[in-house]
């Protein structure tokens, strides 16, 4: 049991109830589930709740296309979501829906408190209106020609071709994506939440340590731009909750969606006698509330949500933790390449524990994107889980059953056990701070030690010698005890494996019994715990995902794609003497790390083979620091040092690409050596 039991409520962002879960979504639920399971393993009271986000125009229109009521559609989707989550071993304490009585009641209560306190304003606005469907059109339901690059069939708020953002009224030849009709402008009175009234409180809150520094920095930019009143209403027809005392007006989905956290917890409290809703959500609550979210919804969770809670007299979250996106094989998930993988497609072909481990091995507390490299995925799972972890038991358990009656020996030399147990607080701290990758590396380093011990001791040789039977018994028992400790450390990540190991060892794996003496303890006969990942299974997933595209994809509009030379024409000629002034050198990236004060920069220590230079490079959007260390690259070595507010930059690394994720540093041939001049 933990020294001081904590009361914790943890949430993941609510999946939208108009489609299936994919592997990008699963990152967040796996990350949160690991954290929740860890808290419970340590003896804390922890409740992991979630719900389907079930309101909005997209759901209303999709249900119409299917010829069913929205309520029927969201019920079907919720059933599919719950099955996917359960099969991925996501252990919610409650999974509900925002379209619920609890959420309707709480959303109305929050709104009325905000209204009565003077935080709700009204304003008449003009919007595009579909005259055939008699409905106002959200930006994404208006299409037309981009006013900048003239590409056709672009959305009402941004262009996929050139990346421009604009107002729907700027579109050329706009049309309704619902009916195809030409929209008209129409006035309507809307309700606004007075977000600027909470600016002082929000500035204090975001700098209180409740957010990652990267998030706090980003929010600081929004304050510089000035907070705006937030439109919280939508006009009928709309699938959602009607606003109290305002017929024909509905809550915008982003108002009742975060209240859905409270609604799901309220539903759980109604099912149980030992839970009190107010103990977690009242202004003076001492419980902890944590939200795990994607970086794309930081604005809603770190500005609107805490301001709404403050205005309604409720407590704010203890912390909001954001993560990055998932890429596959170094690129955005793609339906045409078969890398836009649904959770169910994965589950039809591979063990969910594989992905849980791979994500854990690459997750940190930062907001970096995570790349699911499918070859690396197979190699890492096969090496770490099958080759190191499970192999430890498979090499030794048979001897215990066949030669020693299935009973473990009293271990004379406990030095290895002591060294493994000495890591428990280090590993626990990594879990607590969401540094799962560091935890996995620590655990696998222990697995290497345990396997080396077995290899050096060679019980398969000892067992052949009559006078070495006790020594063989000791080695195998010691190995299985180390295996037990390792699986206990991994239990939040690999719950199904832990369950199978508990059946094999005939004991529960808990943090409290890590140091238990197993002398004389009887184990069951060993059965295979995990199979290797075969590339044919991965190939089957990719092929199945391509087939999904053929069934569901909409016809794509051909776009004129400019070549790199067209986008970035060659500059004016320079003389050879001008070029000769630039000293390009091979450098090895000795160290790479984040710059807390900057959103786009990484700090690099570049080894020139006898001299080290510090460079601040704007490549954070494309690279995680750990992926750069050890790589060779090319740098401008004689660039004048530049004083920046976080240090001096002594050069520049070379990279190609338009920017963002599409940026690649120059990597010379492996025969090149640090310090060599590029000629």
UniProtKB/Swiss-Prot annotation:
UniProt KW keywords: Aminoacyl-tRNA synthetase, ATP-binding, Cytoplasm, Ligase, Metal-binding, Nucleotide-binding, Protein biosynthesis, RNA-binding, tRNA-binding, Zinc
InterPro entries referenced in this protein's UniProt entry, alphabetically: aa-tRNA-synth_I_CS, Anticodon_Met, Met-tRNA-synth_bsu_C, Met-tRNA_ligase_1, Met-tRNA_synth, Methionyl/Leucyl_tRNA_Synth, MetRS_core, MetRS_Zn
Organism encoding this protein: Shewanella halifaxensis (strain HAW-EB4)
Pfam family, one: Anticodon_3
Segments traversing the membrane: none
Cofactor(s) needed for function: Zn(2+)
Residue ranges of domain tRNA-binding in the record: 578-679
Recorded catalytic activity of this chain's protein: tRNA(Met) + L-methionine + ATP = L-methionyl-tRNA(Met) + AMP + diphosphate
Protein's job: Is required not only for elongation of protein synthesis but also for the initiation of all mRNA translation through initiator tRNA(fMet) aminoacylation.
Keyword RNA-binding: yes
Family under the similarity heading: Belongs to the class-I aminoacyl-tRNA synthetase family. MetG type 1 subfamily.
Gene coding for it: metG
Positions bound to Zn(2+): 146, 149, 159, 162
Motif 'HIGH' region location, chain numbering: 15-25
A single MF term (Gene Ontology): tRNA binding
Protein name: Methionine--tRNA ligase
């Amino acid at each position: 049991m933990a020294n001081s039991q904590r009361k914790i409520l943890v949430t993941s962002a609510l999946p939208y109830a108009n489609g299936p879960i994919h592997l990008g979504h699963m990152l967040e639920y796996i990350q949160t589930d690991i954290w929740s399971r860890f808290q419970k393993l340590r003896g804390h009271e922890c409740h992991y709740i979630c719900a389907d986000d079930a309101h909005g125009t997209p759901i209303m229109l999709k249900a119409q296309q299917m010829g069913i009521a929205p309520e029927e559609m969201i019920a079907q989707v919720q059933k599919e979501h719950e099955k996917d989550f359960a099969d991925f071993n996501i252990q919610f304490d409650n999974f509900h829906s925002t379209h619920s009585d609890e959420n309707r009641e709480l959303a109305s209560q929050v709104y009325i408190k905000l209204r009565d306190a003077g935080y709700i304003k009204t304003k008449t606005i003009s919007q595009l209106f579909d005259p055939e469907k008699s409905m106002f059109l959200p930006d994404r339901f208006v299409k037309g020609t981009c006013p900048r690059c003239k590409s056709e069939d672009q959305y009402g708020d941004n262009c996929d071709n050139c990346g421009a953002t604009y107002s729907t009224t700027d579109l050329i030849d706009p049309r309704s994506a619902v009916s195809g009709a030409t929209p008209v402008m129409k006035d309507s009175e809307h309700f606004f939440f007075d977000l600027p009234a909470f600016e002082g409180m929000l500035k204090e809150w975001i700098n209180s340590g409740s957010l990652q520094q990267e998030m706090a920095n980003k929010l600081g930019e929004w304050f510089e731009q000035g907070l705006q009143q937030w439109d919280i209403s939508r006009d009928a027809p709309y699938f959602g909750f009607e606003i109290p005392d305002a017929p024909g007006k509905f809550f915008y989905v982003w108002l009742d969606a975060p209240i859905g956290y409270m609604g799901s917890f309220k539903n759980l409290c109604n099912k149980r006698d030992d839970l009190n809703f107010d103990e977690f959500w009242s202004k003076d609550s001492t419980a902890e509330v944590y939200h795990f979210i994607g970086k794309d919804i930081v604005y809603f969770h770190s500005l609107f949500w805490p301001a709404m809670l403050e205005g309604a007299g409720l407590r704010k979250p203890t912390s909001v933790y954001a993560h990055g996106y998932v890429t596959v094989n170094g690129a955005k998930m793609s339906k045409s390449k078969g890398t836009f993988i649904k959770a169910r497609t994965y589950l039809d072909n591979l063990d969910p524990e594989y992905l849980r481990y791979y994500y854990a091995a690459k997750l940190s507390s930062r907001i970096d994107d995570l790349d699911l490299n499918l070859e690396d995925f197979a190699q890492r799972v096969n090496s770490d889980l099958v080759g190191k972890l499970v192999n430890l038991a498979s090499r030794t358990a048979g001897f215990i059953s066949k030669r020693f009656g299935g009973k473990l020996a009293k271990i004379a030399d406990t030095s290895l056990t002591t060294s493994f147990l000495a890591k428990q607080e280090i590993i626990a701290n990594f879990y607590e701070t969401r540094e799962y990758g560091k935890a996995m590396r620590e655990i696998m380093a222990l697995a290497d030690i345990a396997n080396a011990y077995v290899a050096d001791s060679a019980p398969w040789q000892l067992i052949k010698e009559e006078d070495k039977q006790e020594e063989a018994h000791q080695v195998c028992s010691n190995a299985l005890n180390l295996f037990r400790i390792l699986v206990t450390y991994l239990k939040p990540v690999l719950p199904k494996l832990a369950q199978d190991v508990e059946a094999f060892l005939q004991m529960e794996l808990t943090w409290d019994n890590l140091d238990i003496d197993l002398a004389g303890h009887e184990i069951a006969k060993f059965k295979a715990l995990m199979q290797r990942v075969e590339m044919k299974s991965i190939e089957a997933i990719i092929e199945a995902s391509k087939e999904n595209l053929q069934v569901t994809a909409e016809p794509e509009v051909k776009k004129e794609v400019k070549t790199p030379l067209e986008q970035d024409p060659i500059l004016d000629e320079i003389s050879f003497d001008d070029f000769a002034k630039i000293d390009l050198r091979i450098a090895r990236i000795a160290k790479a790390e984040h710059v807390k004060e900057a959103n786009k920069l990484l700090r690099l220590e570049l080894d020139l083979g006898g001299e080290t230079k510090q460079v601040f490079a704007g490549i954070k959007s494309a690279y995680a620091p750990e992926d750069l260390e050890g790589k060779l690259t090319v740098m401008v070595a004689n660039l004048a040092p530049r004083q920046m507010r976080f240090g001096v930059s002594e050069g520049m690394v070379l990279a190609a690409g338009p920017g963002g994720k599409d940026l690649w540093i120059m990597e010379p041939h492996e025969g090149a050596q640090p310090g060599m001049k590029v000629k």
